[in-house]
């Protein structure tokens, strides 16, 4: 099933602005997994969501100096404008870079992460079906297991390619 909050606006399934403003009351202490999740979330919000999870972490650390610089003045940051222009996740990206600033300022010992980090299923229905039927190809294309080419699986593109390769057309 699905969970839908009663409120109309300020909720985790709301707009980018609503998601960017949300913070948990109780934070989670720093750990390698928390930092990795924050790095993946940052890359996702910057539009780098089609590369592997490891590459998203690497992408974030490659841009860390710019991320920390952008956190000083997000409104006037050229880097932030480059990675958030016309993005659906601009405010979430701002929240993520401010979280990196907090980690930098407090240090790992005193840091608590209050930022909700969304984890999106690739295609949850196909993921469940692939797992239950032990369909290796389906599991690879829905990212239940690692793809052999170390790519992010994309079941929708595989289906679309199959349809087009078999001569189906849309009229």
Residue positions per predicted region:
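Non-catalytic nucleic-acid-binding interfaces of large nucleic-acid enzymes and RNP effectors
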Residues: 2-171
